[in-house]
Amino acid sequence: MVESQCMLGPAKGKDFDDSIVLGPVIVTRDELDNPYNLRMQARINGETWCDNNSNTIHWKFSDMIAHISKSETLYPGEVIGSGTVGLGCGLEHLRFLNDGDIVELEVEKIGVISNKVIRR
């Protein structure tokens, strides 16, 4: 997969039914002064697992859009997932989610989303 060769991860292999969560708030580009300088945190059951900044991303949003547009048609209003913030993957820390865990993701100037892990 070309995404893996470009350090994009298995991008097209990460989206499954019911796997994408949005909200409670989304913002448009004009609402953020600088999307490349936002504090981002991940907490599991109240414990901080990741505290980083959007300035650690490998690819700018314009680069991601250009890459996706090579093989797919994008329409106004579509949402593009940009991946995991630096050091935000549990595998990097040898820590994994369990059934019942509460995952909170927070992005400065946007808000917090909280979800419970449910094993199917």
Identify the residue ranges that each predicted region occupies.
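Catalytic-pocket segment enriched in acidic/His residues
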Residues: V2-R120
